[in-house]
């Protein structure tokens, strides 16, 4: 239980992808003009990070030590596939959010925060936070940290613009 709480708190606060590592700054700056759009982007990134952490865990097991040099390229391909599925889902289910996110939705593919979560998981301990569940949990918590930062920044931005 302590380990799970540690993963959650570290991913949201002490290893926050935006506030600490400065990953994912482009969509952070571009989408943080309205709170609802920022929240939608944060939730999309959280969803992609969770799925990418799970998928990259499985891919990392398949790659093994022999093809470790291919890790980054394969992770980018996996993330791009996941983003395409999320984009199709949002276009059909929530067209208003799809329109609001605009170009920033496909840019989740190249969002350093998503790739960073997969790579941090792969390098932590015995690889992928020493298990499937901790790596997915880190992805979800990292996405929630991203969401927290982007929503807070949108709130401050709205307040300053008034």
Describe each model-derived feature in a short phrase.
Residues 60-70, 91-102, 161-162:
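Membrane interface segments of multi-pass transport proteins and intramembrane proteases
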Residues 43-60, 110-115:
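A generic, lipid-embedded transmembrane alpha helix
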Residues 129-162:
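C-terminal transmembrane helix-loop-helix hairpin of multi-pass membrane proteins
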Residues 1-5, 58-70, 118-136:
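Helix-coil boundary and interhelical linker segments in multi-pass alpha-helical membrane proteins
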Residues 22-37, 83-97, 153-162:
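C-terminal ends of transmembrane helices
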Residues 3-18, 66-79, 136-149:
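Structural signature of hydrophobic alpha-helical transmembrane segments
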Residues 22-30, 87-93, 104-105, 112-129:
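Generic transmembrane alpha-helix signature in multi-pass membrane proteins
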Residues 36-47, 69-75, 97-109:
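Cytoplasmic-side transmembrane-helix entry/capping segments in multi-pass membrane proteins
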